[in-house]
A protein has these predicted regions:
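Conserved, mostly hydrophobic/aromatic
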Residues: 24, 57, 92, 134, ...
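C-terminal extensions of enzymes
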Residues: 1-20, 26-33, 41-42, 146-152, ...
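Glycine-rich phosphate/ribose-binding loops and adjacent secondary-structure elements
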Residues: 163-166, 175, 179, 184-305
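A non-catalytic, amphipathic alpha-helix used as a structural packing/dimerization or gating element
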Residues: 129, 133-136, 160, 164-171, ...
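Generic secondary-structure signature for well-ordered alpha-helical cores
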Residues: 139, 170, 174-177, 240-243, ...
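Glycine- and acidic
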Residues: 152-155, 159, 216-222, 330-333
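Non-catalytic, usually N-terminal nucleic-acid engagement modules in DNA/RNA processing proteins
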Residues: 1-182, 296
Length: 375
């Protein structure tokens, strides 16, 4: 994987770049739709390409390990062959999912024992077998296995957690460097900066990660309940240290406002389930604000969902989408998911264009407040 830093905003740390993988190029800043089990919920790949304009999607190691399982994925020739997506894929290590299983997991220095949320069967993840699993899945970008401490962890727990994450990171890189890709194309490993909301721990973690010289670096453990301003502060602390010539990935974030604020602070890559999850619950993001399509106010509004959006937005009206949600038609969730994902991709594409044009901060300031309005 290669990263070319193409433009930097003169009034902020916002950047425009180009990531090149063996499955294609990714223009940054970029939003990556989440395909947890190998699919983006409710959206065909043809729609992801033509309507959403997705350049890269996510898969999740924990979920793919459980279903369909490694035997199926290996026999298929990896996730790209299995699901038919021929553009780049990034896989999360499954750490966040495993550590979310409160009460059904046991943490040890060797790794983490957990029970499947599907059938209760016991499993054990280590840095080594997670690297092996991600090799079998075959994503272009693999994430290191880390502990994801609760957002409100006290300092002592956060420090011990970071020490464990750093030990695991060393083991991840050792295993990654000892093994080869299975399917004839290159894979990259991104380490993850943890440290909760403690500046000194975040700085220590960022230095440790930067010293690995990886193809890119991730910031994890944010947007887990801490105040938004604290999240922005942690991003600033970390990005002062992470190398400027490598892409920076903020994991699991967030709202359109969050994304623009993070871009301004030097973040290049984003993922979040919010566009699809909120879409399935009738909440649509637009440049004017958010719309709850179940509200009666849309019942007689025969204007397009978004006249400046994708073809789906221009084809269907607000009144029709309101009707579909009231009637509990599956098409409602599909239309809303496509709209929201297309809007997120449009947002980061517009941000990139304004970074290149040199007026990103002015553009951001002109739209940031209205993005959060309820229409």
């Amino acid at each position: 994987m290669k990263f070319e830093l193409q433009h930097t905003d003169t009034a902020s740390d916002a950047r425009a770049g180009l990531i090149t993988t063996d499955h294609g190029q990714i223009k940054t800043p970029i939003f990556m739709p989440v395909g947890t089990c190998g699919s983006v919920k409710g959206v065909h790949f043809s729609e992801l390409k033509e309507q959403v304009k997705a350049q890269i999607i996510l898969g999740n190691t924990y979920h793919l390990y459980l279903r369909p399982g490694l035997d199926v994925l290996k026999a298929a020739g990896g996730l790209h062959k299995f699901n038919g997506w021929d553009r780049p894929i990034l896989t999360d290590s499954g750490g966040f999912q495993v550590f979310s299983l409160t009460g059904i997991r046991k943490l040890k220095e060797e790794g983490c024992e957990f029970r499947s949320h599907i059938d209760g069967s016991k499993h054990f993840f280590t840095p080594e077998n997670v690297m092996d699993t991600e090799r079998i899945i075959g994503a272009d970008i693999m994430m290191a296995f880390d502990e994801c401490p609760p957002g409100k962890s006290d300092y002592n727990y956060a420090k011990k957690s970071l020490e464990l994450t750093q030990k695991w990171l060393d083991r991840c890189f050792k295993r990654f460097n000892e093994t080869e890709p299975l399917y004839g194309y290159q894979q990259s490993l991104f380490p993850i900066v943890q440290g909760c909301t403690y500046k000194d721990l975040r700085r220590e973690a960022a230095k440790y990660v930067a010293d690995k010289g990886a193809d890119g670096n991730a910031i994890g453990g944010l947007a887990v309940g801490e105040p938004t301003e604290v999240m922005y502060e942690m991003i600033e602390v970390v990005n002062e240290i992470l190398p400027k010539d490598k892409p920076r990935y903020l994991m699991g974030v967030g709202t359109p406002q969050n994304i623009l604020e993070a871009i301004e602070r030097g973040v290049d890559m984003f993922d979040c389930v919010m566009p699809t999850r909120n879409g399935r619950n009738a909440m649509l993001f637009t440049y004017e604000g958010t719309m709850n399509m179940r509200n009666k106010k849309w019942e007689m509004d025969f204007s397009p969902i978004d006249p400046d959006g994708c073809d789906v937005d221009k084809t269907y009206t607000k009144a029709y989408l309101h009707h579909l949600f009231k009637a509990q038609e599956l098409l409602a969730m599909q239309i809303a998911s496509i709209h929201n994902l297309a809007f997120y991709l449009r947002l980061v594409t517009d941000a990139r264009q304004h970074i290149i044009a040199g007026d990103f901060t002015q553009w951001k300031s002109s739209i940031i407040d209205q993005l959060g309005r309820r229409l």
